[in-house]
């Protein structure tokens, strides 16, 4: 808790990644943090932070607007894609890879791209699209053994946009 306070006090652009997994479930809630500029989480983490078992993403988004949460935030939805929630709108981007091999690290890959782009470029739909493509490519490999290259990313983007 003390480290969180130190970070929030001394860093003015704070991106937060809280993807729940089997090792940290129930311990990594976004509600522990008060000051951040961007939040990325999976649907399970979204449910945990809102203290609900509700599965409908639209209901969860509506419920989040009644709770204290900073905008923008992104929720990864696995094979369904992801959604970026801002104060006045939500933007959904589908998944482009449906035959994944291993999703370990995909949330981290999504966060790496979207948090960096959120800092430098404010086209949130483009950021979400690139995050989904990068995370989807990452899920085509076992574990974190191989990182997606710039060429693989460019080739996939061109293929999707054709």
PLM feature spans:
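Conserved phosphate-binding/catalytic region of the ribokinase-like
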Residues: 2-36, 50-162
């Amino acid at each position: 808790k003390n480290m969180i306070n130190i970070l929030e006090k001394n860093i003015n652009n704070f991106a937060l990644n809280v993807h729940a997994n089997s090792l940290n479930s129930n311990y990594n809630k976004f509600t522990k943090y008060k000051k951040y500029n961007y939040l990325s989480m999976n649907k399970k983490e979204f449910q945990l932070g809102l203290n609900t078992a509700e599965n409908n993403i639209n209901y969860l988004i509506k419920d989040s607007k009644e709770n204290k949460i900073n905008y923008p935030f992104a929720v990864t939805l696995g094979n369904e894609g992801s959604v970026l929630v801002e104060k006045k709108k939500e933007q959904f981007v589908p998944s482009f890879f449906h035959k994944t091999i291993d999703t370990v690290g995909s949330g981290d890959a999504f966060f790496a791209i979207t948090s960096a782009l959120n800092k430098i470029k404010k086209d949130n739909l483009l950021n979400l699209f690139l995050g989904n493509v990068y995370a989807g490519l990452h899920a085509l490999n076992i574990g974190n053994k191989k990182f997606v290259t710039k060429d693989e990313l460019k080739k996939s983007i061109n293929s999707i946009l054709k």
